[in-house]
Amino acid sequence: MSTAKKDYKRITTKSLIEMKSNGEKISMLTAYDYTMAKIVDTAGVDVILVGDSASNVMAGHETTLPITLDQMIYHASSVVRAVERGLVVVDLPFGSYQSDPKEALRSAIRIMKESGAHAVKLEGGKEIKESIKKILNAGIPVMGHLGLTPQSIYKFGTYSVRAKEEQEAEKLIEDAQMLEKVGCFGVVLEKIPADLAKKVADSISIPVIGIGAGGAVDGQVLVIHDMLGMNNEFSPRFLRRYLNLYEEMTKAIGQYAADVKSSDFPNASEQY
């Protein structure tokens, strides 16, 4: 297996499969607006996920369930306008694909047409197989999502690690293989044991991107607000914080407010 890194001017679904076959890890982060997406893309992140986690970090909801298709399209279109290199993947939100394959296709088409995104992501396995096939048959690239699927939080009752038991682990492997067979270009595995994630990654040729799934998969994804330390209340075991922006931003904004109160801002050099 080659470890030579290819310089991709534009990441495509084909690029990601090549990266896996060449042993090159895939980086993936969320973004929900133009400015953040521009920074993420300029930094060289391969895949930019417009996640339904916007429901949490942008709108303040406790779960991902409330965000609507219209809201996802708004966020996605903002991101797409900023991105020049990365592959933009958009979550189909809860309620936009679960009822039947035709609804799933309509939702996916709206995202692609109205935002200009490059692919969609759906949560689930065999239970949404027909919806995935319907979307793929329309020429829309699909990424799967298995393990802890946040849209099913009320079914699980907890955000704890999934697929610890043999039966659930076997189903997860079968679902991952099904996703590859029907034509998905990749799959996200969330919060499952590292050894199981490795088995999945080794059993399929499409990239496996982990979040809380160990280091033996083909790439990693995090929510950007979490890895930049913009939320002090969320600190799962899998999260590595690269900055403490909550503290730094609070300090900077506090200093600005103090400077305004004291008439220190603006000074003579900051006026026309």
Curated annotation (Swiss-Prot):
Record-linked SUPFAM superfamilies: Phosphoenolpyruvate/pyruvate domain
Active site location: E190 (proton acceptor)
Protein localization: Cytoplasm
Gene3D superfamilies: Phosphoenolpyruvate-binding domains
GO cellular component: cytoplasm
Keyword Transferase: yes
Known catalytic reactions: 3-methyl-2-oxobutanoate + (6R)-5,10-methylene-5,6,7,8-tetrahydrofolate + H2O = 2-dehydropantoate + (6S)-5,6,7,8-tetrahydrofolate
EC identifiers of the protein: 2.1.2.11
Keyword DNA-binding belongs to the record: no
Example of a GO MF term: magnesium ion binding
Cofactor(s) in the UniProt record: Mg(2+)
Keywords: Cytoplasm, Magnesium, Metal-binding, Pantothenate biosynthesis, Transferase
Quaternary structure annotation from Swiss-Prot or TrEMBL: Homodecamer; pentamer of dimers.
PANTHER family recorded: 3-METHYL-2-OXOBUTANOATE HYDROXYMETHYLTRANSFERASE
Family annotation (HAMAP family): PanB
Similarity remark: Belongs to the PanB family.
Functional summary from the UniProt entry: Catalyzes the reversible reaction in which hydroxymethyl group from 5,10-methylenetetrahydrofolate is transferred onto alpha-ketoisovalerate to form ketopantoate.
Protein name: 3-methyl-2-oxobutanoate hydroxymethyltransferase
Organism: Flavobacterium johnsoniae (strain ATCC 17061 / DSM 2064 / JCM 8514 / BCRC 14874 / CCUG 350202 / NBRC 14942 / NCIMB 11054 / UW101) (Cytophaga johnsonae)
